[in-house]
Amino acid sequence: MREILPIESIKERDIDLVLLEELNVNHQFCEWFIQSVGLPEITAHEGAWRSITAYGKGETDILFSYHANDEKVYVLIENKLDAYFQHEQSKRYDSRASTYCEDGSCTVAFTVLVAPRQYCENQHDFEQYVTYESIGEFLRSTGGDRGIFKNHLLDIAIHKLRRGFQAV
């Protein structure tokens, strides 16, 4: 018998919502996420927001804010599943990060790509990245049935990429 998938097709927005939930309610995930890219250690959580447009410099898929001692940290997350980067997209992320620091919204800001491993390893626009595979493994190993289900959703997204998209 053929496996029945809980969802036929995963879109980037679906993964955004998984990330948004975890970054807002799962402190252990937040700590793991920032440690996996070597960001300053979290001392207080502020929150995460989806689809933030700022300064006329494009959109941030997810903006995650936390405190590291007396520093307010912004993490601008670009989630990429099966599309090419827009022209100078990473530069616009860097520009928004700099502007957030300059206008006092935060003390320090970082940009991070979240995507399937195949995508991350074949791009040169973002220096820091977290793979869908590592997120899925973390959720599977720490989140009980809920984490196993979310890992399954990420696996569906990863297989979607493998079936039809090649990052260049």
PLM-predicted stretches and their roles:
Residues M1-V168:
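Charged, terminal alpha-helix-loop-beta segments
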